[in-house]
Amino acid sequence: MRVSVLRRFGNLPTTPLYTGLIKTMLRRFPSILTMLCLLLSFLPAASVHAATPTPAIDPLTSAQKMLAKMTPEERVGQLFLVTFTGSTADQNSQVYSLIHDYHVGGVVLQTANDNFVSSPDTISSAYQLISQLQNIEYQASQSQPASSGTAAPNGTGTPASTETVEVLPTAVPANYIPLFVGISQPGDGSPDDQIFNGLTPLPDLMALGATWDPALSEKVGAVAGQELSGLGFNLYFGPSLDVLETPESTLGNGLGASAFGGDPYWVGAMGSAYITGLHTGSNDHLTVIASHFPGRGSADRPAGGEPATVRKSLESLKQIELAPYFSVTGDATTPAGTADGLLVSHIRYQGFQGNIRSITPPVSFDSQALSQILALPAFASWRTAGGMMVSDDLGSPTVRRFYDPAGTSFLARLVARDAFLAGNDLLFMGNIISSDSNDNYATVVNTLGFFNQKYHDDKAFAQRVDESVLRILTAKYRTYGDFNIQTAVPSVDGLDSLGQSTAVTFEVARQSATLVSPNMADLDTLLPSAPVFRDQIVFLTDTRTERQCSTCNESPMLAVDALQNVILRLYGSQVGGQVSSGHLVSYTFTSLKAILAGGPGDPSLEGTLRQANWVVINMLDAEPGEDQTKTLHSFLSERQDLLRDKNIVVFAFNAPYFLDPTDISKLTAYYCLYSKSAPFVEVAARLLFKELSPQGDLPVSVQGVGYDLFTATRPDPGQVIGLSQQLPEAPVSTISATPEATATPKVGDTFSVRTSTILDHNGHPVPDGTVVHFTVSLKGADGVVQQMYAVTSQGVAAISFSIPRAGLLEVAAESDPALTSVILQLNVSGGGFSVTIVAPTTVPEFTPTATFMSTPLVTPSAPLAQGYPGLGGWFGMVLLLVVLGGVVYWLGSRFMSVRWAVRWMLCTVAGGLLAYTYLAVRLPGASDYLKLGGFSGMIGVVLLGAALGLGAALLWQRLVTGSTKRSG
């Protein structure tokens, strides 16, 4: 074997010396290899990763390169999101032409346009349609060599020619850019979702808000992101970041349970978590467009009619409406929690637009107002980083009513132009139909032609187009990294995993279920037990229908017997026999009309209700104008004879604020489930039979039960705020033979204190920004009281201060109305230090917890009583002035005369006394100064007064001396 190895070294000398050397190396090769491996193991870890793959190209750089290659028509097309009718996109379809010939940037799929088919083919058909749409764009880009944009003098690629351009379909695009394929799927099925079957039935946003758990919100977002991106969607409209500060069903903002809640901080926290889930669940293949910017939670009317108005000041808008949008843009804590774009709503805002008139445009068409909003720091930094603005549906009735109130002339191209120049980058055309066009397709084509013409004629307009297209391309590169059909169209194998995450929805249903009325203590009295076998139960259900498409069969949003069937499945004769199927009967709200005033009567229904022990009412939303809602109100007010001596339980499968106080007073129990999918119906059944307890808390104010969210989210006055030393974050660990010792605080060091998590009335962390007042006291002969303020972050506030001298230091905290905290005592002495936690006297069960060494000290009386000079402060002032007076007298007698020495001393002491008197009698400004400066501040004021007195004496001497010289 060794000979064969040696023969491989054909050019080596064959002398015995070389032969022996090679034999020796071969013999010792295992030892040499072992030594090399051992040496390599000591190399730094960084060297192992030195040959990592080349990092991905920056999306902005890729977008700039693509923009330079695009024709004007391709650029203009990227601005438009279009809709179309039907569930296919063959070569004869209008959407095929819009993609192939006019290069539109994206499409939006909607149930109203029959883009989806009925179950069981809903998912497979949607996947095929999206794949078909992306392939139209891809095949068109491959049919010709790549084009290069005609460079303009400004270098943007804008053609220099300004000649009139004939509007015709252009040659197929030579640059492949994946389409945006968008959808709005906020949860809870119809009417807001677009896909009703085949996907996991996700909850409404308010159900997430009622859990007060951002982690659950992120999980739901991840499910939505994974399933929608698996179908091929890459543009998501949502989540809604509207703040329902004072929800009023009488006005109706149209949001129902499609908002997280009414607290700006929590809406932002839940929204940020949801966006994080969308990004991570889709592997960053979803471009997330948060809605409905700048917020329509306080709108005076629902969308769909004339433009709504939000009458709030600018400051109020920044604190309430805009706060959640700050948290997902410039103030976002993570890239995953940052929205890629904002959907600009067609609403007017007094805080940005001044007095609102009928001619005041919605903010989506008001360049001055929108620019003012986007100039706010959080939005400005986000826009600089590539954030997109997307117009809401330009074909909505709201837009048409504003532009054409008389119904005579509606020019879509001008609407699109105004929205674009107002600051929107991406224009959602919707089903817009211009008065000079036959249909939506012709309207979009004419609008594209109008934009192309302006691009050629107007350099400023062309530059504005290029800016928006660069944002759009950057967003698409962030989504895909590289433009190829393999990444734009997901694998069909992923469809098998869709709709398998119902466990997440059930967990949300379990944690969000809320007892609205009465409270838990009263519930056990009013409803001590669950239904039993002999009880008769009548279910009254608000049944409405939905269609996946115009030719699809109708199906109920909430089946009339949905709750009855779940109860039989869980508690019927097959599983313990807690109830009898013969004792359960279900009716619709419509059936109640027969037994109301003016109805024909229904003896059978009346008889069933009279015999019932339980009446369980399942209601959906109750916006004004809903006939079902009127029926329920009439039933509760007119037929109390049928409800007397019965257990009346209401389950609200939407928002909780639709019943008034009078209606609620007639109920035994009122629960809110927020969503109507199967997991929520099951939780309702388990609540009725007391198998589960409601764990959720109302995320909005409910006037019907006197629940005010602002009060509920303030600190709970019954809690004791904990305090602890806040240690600096440990540095990144490195291999070390001996750990470093913990630093010991000493005089002059900075000491940090943090609170425990401060809880609100519902037991959740208080919103960020809650003010906490700290009192820092240094005990001693010249003790100090210092007032410090901090705001919470995730329920915790912290302060840092310098240790002025050795002694006993105490720290307390309060956050109105929570006024009690433990006392943190820091004892610093020459021999060491100790930190002791002392429980407040009002909470005897707490015991002091000491760390390190603890030496009890006698605490002298404070020199400042409640922030003002006390006896200790007076003695300190007198001592100081005696010393100062003595020094001044000695200097005067040595350098001047005894007479002037006495005058200097008296003026110095008088100045100090006057300054002390100013503080002691609490003249204007004294209180605030002492609270900030404490005892040292008082000494400073006395010294200043003494200095002014001495200065007056010197001036007096100079005047007298000068007068004597002149007389002489």
Stretches found by the model and what they are:
Residues 71, 91, 119-128, 132, ...:
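Second-shell residues forming the walls of enzyme active-site clefts
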Residues 42-54:
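Sec-dependent signal peptide cleavage junction
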Residues 117-189, 209-232, 236, 265, ...:
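Active-site-adjacent structural elements in enzyme catalytic domains
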Residues 98-123, 328-363, 610-625, 917-924:
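Short acidic, glycine-rich surface-loop motifs adjacent to enzyme active sites
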Residues 51-103, 196, 384, 403-772, ...:
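Preference for extracellular/luminal or secreted protein segments
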Residues 51-197, 201, 518, 612, ...:
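N-terminal hydrophobic targeting/anchoring segments and the immediately downstream early-domain regions
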Residues 33-44:
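Bacterial N-terminal signal peptides
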Residues 77-84, 105-109, 179-187, 235-239, ...:
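Hydrophobic faces of well-ordered beta-strands that scaffold small-molecule active sites
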